[in-house]
Amino acid sequence: MPPIYERIEQDLIVQERTLWTALTSADPPPELERLSHPDAIWLFPKKDITDVESLPQTFADKFHHFESYDLEDVRVIVIDLMAGTITYRIRATHGKKQYVATGATTWGQGSDGEWRIISHQQTLQ
């Protein structure tokens, strides 16, 4: 694997952790909007398909407010120099409640050099 691909892999892992820090915060939408491509799509369990404009409504019930989370079995696919997908298993807790799901996020890098979410999906296990 070329060294640039290794750097892209590491960048995407850092971005995914930034995403999950935002997802588990008290007010996710502002940071999620910043991280997202304008046409990004979000697929959460038991929620309608969400776009950037509907993030505030999707998070109104605080369904994703976890105290802790851990990403396991992280795999990165570098699509090209400006795009990649990361998949993993997520384990999160809220009080005594456990949340276990698989996750996948596709990231694209804009002309400004910033990574933006193109799509994000979680599937309950």
What are these model-derived regions, one by one?
Residues 37:
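ATP/adenylate-binding site constellation spanning eukaryotic-like Ser/Thr protein kinases
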Residues 2-33, 41-125:
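A beta-strand edge to alpha-helix "cap/lid" segment located at domain peripheries
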